[in-house]
């Protein structure tokens, strides 16, 4: 039996759709019944995952029913809508985007949670990603942090869970979300708990840096959705505190960052324990070669959706100010800047190293500024406290490294200051994207030195494309310096022309 009354109120309504089941249906393993695999579907995917389904119980994963409003959209209207919202799609049998939450076909209890959250319309990634995910197909989503991607996979995950048999004693989760950092995992779990509460879906968050006891108890009680960092999840599996035999919906969030942080072996080990006909959703902000290669191992005939241009661009709502200064001028420049802008608003200051974060924070505090730092050497309790102080405004200045800040969803950051210029232009765009979210205005200040000169030309292009002023010093530096070679600090490919065709 299914867990819940579906849209029709019939608890078995989804169970009749055998052609869309994960096992025992068509060879497309969850694609719509009209789709047939072809060589073109597998271009660039020389070894799609091998399916040994002996002894595996069938499961449902295609729940999408196109609404009349969506069905009525002409091809021209679909093309115009995608162009307006900067949606690029690849794959076979691609569903049309949805313009409203009701068009997705979510059950009423999900729609109630969406309404309570105050959302008015789907974001671009939700508009196209929801019907793709609800069809049960594998999905590659390339979208920035803050784009609404978390709900793009969580709401279909809730529908997926409620269509499966109830957990039995000793069962592991049905949905597994892998995330690179503790902070991101906690944020995902908070959203999963909020939107899954009305259907009594149990969730837990598994990450290192804290005692295992409470996490072990959650797993042993049985939870439908687990959000985890790779290392701690493997610990739990090896100590027999959980298993992945029931996982039929797998999410890899921020896959590019997980690979950057060296999690490739752990990810491969985890996925090897999950049934091969699962549905896999693979999310990344960028599309470098190593991310593409991993996707080919884990995904079969996926949809692909890219939000935004194939080149990273800065948000036009963000005012960008780049000052060319010397290294020795940085701290005095920072203090002068804080004196000018400090109004109680949240200010996020980026530095390259943990040591630099601590040094600048210590100096600021000695000078009377309410600053705290966050980086990977701090305990989980310290990190939680720093974030709480920053979010509440008690300490409105926070210094951070890129890794520590990645995935943090702190609302109302008014200013970003790049004390140290990052190691790539992609990271520059990520950093300044911490402000100017959800239609708000923001300002990003950047200290740029001669040591950063190799980025001057491409940085100038970013500023000009976003309609920003370029200082004569930066423009001059850009004209006299060659840009970094590919793979050494420039933009990474965002995947619009490679891989799945």
UniProtKB/Swiss-Prot annotation:
The keyword Hydrolase applies. It is found in: Nucleus. Residues 130-305 form the Helicase ATP-binding domain. Disulfide bonds: none annotated. It catalyses: ATP + H2O = ADP + phosphate + H(+). ATP binds at residues 143-150. The lineage of its organism: Eukaryota, Viridiplantae, Streptophyta, Embryophyta, Tracheophyta. It is an enzyme of class 3 (hydrolase). GO terms for molecular function: ATP binding; ATP hydrolysis activity; RNA binding; RNA helicase activity. Keywords: ATP-binding, Helicase, Hydrolase, Nonsense-mediated mRNA decay, Nucleotide-binding, Nucleus, Ribosome biogenesis, RNA-binding, rRNA processing. It holds the Pfam family Helicase_C. Its main location: nucleus. Belongs to the DEAD box helicase family. DDX5/DBP2 subfamily. Gene3D superfamilies: P-loop containing nucleotide triphosphate hydrolases (3.40.50.300). A motif (DEAD box) lies at residues 253-256. The Q motif is unique to and characteristic of the DEAD box family of RNA helicases and controls ATP binding and hydrolysis. Residues 1-20, 38-53, 491-501 have a biased composition (Basic and acidic residues). A motif (Q motif) lies at residues 99-127. This is DEAD-box ATP-dependent RNA helicase 20.
């Amino acid at each position: 039996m299914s867990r819940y009354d579906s849209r029709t109120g019939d608890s078995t309504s989804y169970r009749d759709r055998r052609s869309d089941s994960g096992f025992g249906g068509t060879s497309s393993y969850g694609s719509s019944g009209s789709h047939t695999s072809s060589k073109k579907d597998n271009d660039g995917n020389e070894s799609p995952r091998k399916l040994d389904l002996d002894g595996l119980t069938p499961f449902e994963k295609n729940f999408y029913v196109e609404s009349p409003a969506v069905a009525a959209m002409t091809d021209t209207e679909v093309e115009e809508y995608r162009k307006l919202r900067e949606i690029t799609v690849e794959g076979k049998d691609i569903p049309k985007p949805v313009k409203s939450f009701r068009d997705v076909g979510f059950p009423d209890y999900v729609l109630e949670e969406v309404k309570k959250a105050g959302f008015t319309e789907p974001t671009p990634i939700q508009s196209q990603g929801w019907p793709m995910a609800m069809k049960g197909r594998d999905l590659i989503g390339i979208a920035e942090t803050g784009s609404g991607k978390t709900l793009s996979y969580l709401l279909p995950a809730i529908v997926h869970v409620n269509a499966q048999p109830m957990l039995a004693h000793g069962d592991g989760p049905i949905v597994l979300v892998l995330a690179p950092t503790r902070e991101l995992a906690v944020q995902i779990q908070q959203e999963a708990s909020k939107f899954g509460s009305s259907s009594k879906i149990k969730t837990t968050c598994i990450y290192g840096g804290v005692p295992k006891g409470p996490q072990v108890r959650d797993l042993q009680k049985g939870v439908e959705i687990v959000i985890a960092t790779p290392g701690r999840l493997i610990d739990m599996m090896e100590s027999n505190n959980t298993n992945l035999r029931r996982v039929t919906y797998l999410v890899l969030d921020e896959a590019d960052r997980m690979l950057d942080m060296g999690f490739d072996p752990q990810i491969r080990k985890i996925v090897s324990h999950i049934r091969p006909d699962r549905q896999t959703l693979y999310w990344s902000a960028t599309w470098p070669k190593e991310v593409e290669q991993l996707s080919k191992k884990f995904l079969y005939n996926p949809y692909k959706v890219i939000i935004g241009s194939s080149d990273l661009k800065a948000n036009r709502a963000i005012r960008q100010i780049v000052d060319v200064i010397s290294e020795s001028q940085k701290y005095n420049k920072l203090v002068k800047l804080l004196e000018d802008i400090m109004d109680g608003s949240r200010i996020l200051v980026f530095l390259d190293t943990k040591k630099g974060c601590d040094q600048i924070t210590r100096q600021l505090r000695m000078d009377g500024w309410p600053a705290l730092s966050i980086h990977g050497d701090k305990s989980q309790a310290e990190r939680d406290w720093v974030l709480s102080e920053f979010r509440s405004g008690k300490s409105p200045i926070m210094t951070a490294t890129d890794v520590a800040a990645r995935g943090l969803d702190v609302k109302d950051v008014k200013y970003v200051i790049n004390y140290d210029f990052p190691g790539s232009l992609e990271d520059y765009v990520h950093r300044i994207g911490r402000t100017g979210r959800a239609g708000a205005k923001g300002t990003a200040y950047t200290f740029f030195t001669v040591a950063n000169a190799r980025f001057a030309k491409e940085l100038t292009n970013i500023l000009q494309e976003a309609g920003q002023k370029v200082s004569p010093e930066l423009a001059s530096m850009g004209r006299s310096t060659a840009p970094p070679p590919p793979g050494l600090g420039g933009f990474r490919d965002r995947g619009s022309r490679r891989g799945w065709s």
